């Protein structure tokens, strides 16, 4: 989002990754954002955002006001990457293993119950 760098396997850390698809115009994304901020404090987890069909200036302003939980933000202006992932709408959250294989997918906003009951057991494996 901030640079035009191409993402490669070398950009992924050797740890589990939360991949979150979001947009500044998405009200449900705002509802889940504080939970993503909390998850980003866990140093055993990497967090990557996919900014979906959004204007860069709007997305950067949104993160500036609310905090940026992502180590990397991928701009998906027309939704091609998200379509390849099978995204139905935003927000959607994935957990990738250390080899970038999808282990978990959640459609809709995450909350504390989803984190505790569904995500943390996978993240702690």
Residue spans for each PLM region:
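C-type cytochrome heme c attachment motif
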Residues: 24-31, 92
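Hydrophobic beta-strand anchors of alpha/beta hydrolase catalytic cores
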Residues: 18-19, 47, 93
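Thiol/disulfide oxidoreductase modules built on the thioredoxin-like
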Residues: 64-69, 76-123
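Short pre-active-site segment immediately N-terminal to redox-active cysteine/selenocysteine motifs
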Residues: 15-17, 22-25, 89
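Structural microenvironment flanking redox-active thiols in thiol-disulfide oxidoreductases
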Residues: 30-67, 77-83
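A short beta-strand-turn-helix
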Residues: 1-17
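Nucleotide phosphate-binding site architecture
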Residues: 27, 37, 103
